[in-house]
Amino acid sequence: MGGFIVFAIILLSLRQVFKVKIHNAMAEISYTLFGIIYVSYLFSHILLLKYEFPNGNILVVMTFMLIWACDISAYLVGMAIGGKIFKHRLAPKISPKKSIEGAIAGILGVFLVILSFDKIYLFIANFVCGISFLTKTCSVNYDYVAIGGLKAFILALAIGVFAELGDLVESKIKRELEVKDSGNLLLGHGGFLDRFDSALFVLPIVYYFMKYVAYL
């Protein structure tokens, strides 16, 4: 990663040298480098989850299930009672529609899914083995680290908080750059980062939780 960043700095600097426009060179280099580090480094934790733990594929799937549980719970509760209990919005200047009620619901939604992790894990493991039955092999390891009680609450709280932070940071970046969407790759869905902004912050959280906390 360090070598890649150095190479990127050299290329970006050379590009600025040969540009006719000489203003805002540092700003352009800084924005580009931030984008490279922000997206590539944070999202690279998906590979760490996949390859550093038994059944990494299943762990990645379950991580995205937690993100979706957080997003869906926050959205539904926010639409239903957002602003009715807590009058102050979560971050009114950055994302006016986000409510404190929705944020709390996101944490609770993640917590409930984590408590069902053992059943979900076995379901996915059996599904993977069912697919691999045609090749008469099953590479799934059924060893599972139960996450319950205080650990489950800590993980749910961390995912709920950092999923919201991921959304807010991406919204802040778009407002700073005065763009509506983060790209046009996913038409009708706001852009690539609009779909994965939560994941960028949550993937590292889950990785370090599994590495340093889950097995305690």
Model segments located where?
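Membrane-embedded alpha-helical bundles of polytopic integral membrane proteins
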Residues: 1-157
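Acidic (Asp/Glu-rich) catalytic motifs at the cytosolic membrane interface
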Residues: 67-83, 87, 91, 96, ...
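Short, conserved aromatic-histidine micro-motifs
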Residues: 126-136, 189-191, 196, 215-216
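A generic structural signal for well-ordered alpha-helical surface patches
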Residues: 151, 171, 206-207
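Juxtamembrane boundary at the C-terminal end of a transmembrane helix
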Residues: 208-216
